[in-house]
């Protein structure tokens, strides 16, 4: 697929560009309530932490305003259709870390609310506990750990088994994701953003091995990209066994 024929999901944003560290930048902004009303013809999108005024219509929880953020320099189109992304297919090694069961729910937003979007390809990638991405440089070239995609089912869900990400200087703990339509009349549509983590949970995770050997991390408040919409991209986490389960719902205007 060439850049010239890529069409982006509007994802209820307006466009602008702002350069960030590590070649990351935010590619959109969160709509105001007035703008969301205009887009949806009276349907209100609920963003995290925002309550509607009394008497104002509400949409299902899956209808949220999702700011777009650039994929950064570490995306590779590996086309690895797998749910468990912890291993590297080149040598079968498995990345150590606190388990994370990740569910992304993709919905198409219309004038009457949200409908689960089936058949969307959802890519996920992130760094390991040491803050290193696969297939980025040096001894990770050709590696594919902590990368993969799933195709959403009838309920719009894509599920992954992974680990809690580490961090690297200048960036808070985060996960990258990309939603793509690779078949059908909407072929070429895509939407890219990032997910962030609650600081208290991250503090507990990073106190455990193999994360604990590292120094002081970059916190959400010190991440310039997080400050531009990251509060609306927080992964909802619950404890699950020795790790966590996380969910995030993505409302896209296709």
Q: Language-model segments: which ranges?
A:
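Exposed beta-sheet edge/beta-hairpin loop segments within beta-rich domains
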Residues: 165-168, 235-241
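N-terminal secretory signal peptides
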Residues: 1-31, 42-48
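N-terminal twin-arginine translocation
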Residues: 29-35, 44-62
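Beta-strand-dominated extracellular/periplasmic modules and repeats
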Residues: 59-228, 247, 251-254
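Intrinsically disordered, low-complexity segments enriched in proline/serine/threonine
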Residues: 14, 54-56, 75
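Low-complexity, intrinsically disordered Gly/Pro/Thr-rich segments
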Residues: 226-238
